[in-house]
Amino acid sequence: MKVKRLQYAMVGGAKGSFIGPIHRMAIRMDDLADLVAGCFSRDPKANVVSGEKLSLDPTRVYSDWKKLIAAEADRLDFLVVCTTNETHYPIAKAALEAGLDVFCEKPLSLTVKEAEELGRIAKRKRLVLGIPFTYTGYPMVKLARDLVKKGELGKIDKVVLEYVQGSFRKIDFTKPLDKRNAWKMNPKVSGPSCVVADIGVHAFTMIEYVTGLEAKTLLADLSSFAPGNRLDDDASILMRLAEPSRSEARERSGTRGATSSTAKASLVVSKIATGEENGVRLRVYGDKASLFWDQESPNYLSVKYPLKPEMTFKRKAPYIADLSDGAQRASRFPAGHHEGFVEALGNIYDEFIAAVVSRKTRDFPGVCAGIRSMRFVEAALKSAKSGSRWTKI
């Protein structure tokens, strides 16, 4: 049976940007959609050149995203938003109001109120809204989720997640910055947070995704260590986890958490972790076993037991299909052929596009995850400003 190829447009993501090309590669991974239009940059020359490099019809390369949505809404299947933070909400809102499904970079907005409004519009118009919390797309993260769900770890007591980078150790914020870094330090563009809104939301979403639990309260200590930096570049956050509400569980494809009433989480996110590159390391401790996953060795998942040898699960090994349908479906290449970040985002796009076609719930971060992540950011900022007091999420 011939499968219809979808058509999409992109706002932001000019040639030379970091995340735009990754989105395009991820979408091409399963060859389900074609880029047919775009508004790639505020810079007119960069916008035109990007369209040319991507072999687009010049008449479908727009100087303004509002013009793009007005002219293309009836011809597109979905819109991808890869712009700076302050424009996520207005672009996503306009696209949803025009009847377009949307895949929007994180953070979904600058405030909880904005994120909730996007959620209401998507629900009212029955549209699909996806967010690239990419680490939830890794096969072994899906295996971790399913092992927890099946009770392999027992009652979950403790979760430790660190997401550490050393990138800000290379930057002097007292001097003029290149475009890629300058906007992240401007509150009018990035919003009121840097590290929490940039990579902290990834860590938060991973914890809720893997455990199936919901963070109820947090205590945050935010710091700015890099000279000249106006926003947070380091965060230490404690969280208390519990079963999600029924409505939240339904929005997470019916996933219920591991049996736990008092689970605690410790989250460390930093951009001043000297020597680190992109260290995402997850540990989940239950009363029967624990697990460990490292994003820099993403094809392996370790499980430790009190009285048995440690087990290392390998992506695409023959036994994976029996343990986790999600991990099996997310594995693309034979065992021993490593998969990474682009493939993980490709998995999320595969599920997002399936939802666009079927109008059914699929396994990707959607409206619920986007709103939850913004509640996390606002709670962390509120806690830090109040002297690191426990704050409701």
Task: Name what the model sees in each region.
Residues 1-55:
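N-terminal Rossmann-like dinucleotide-binding module
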Residues 56-121:
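Beta-loop-alpha module in the N-terminal Rossmann-like domain of NAD(P)-dependent dehydrogenases
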Residues 257, 282, 288-364, 393:
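C-terminal glycine/acidic-rich active-site capping loop/insertion
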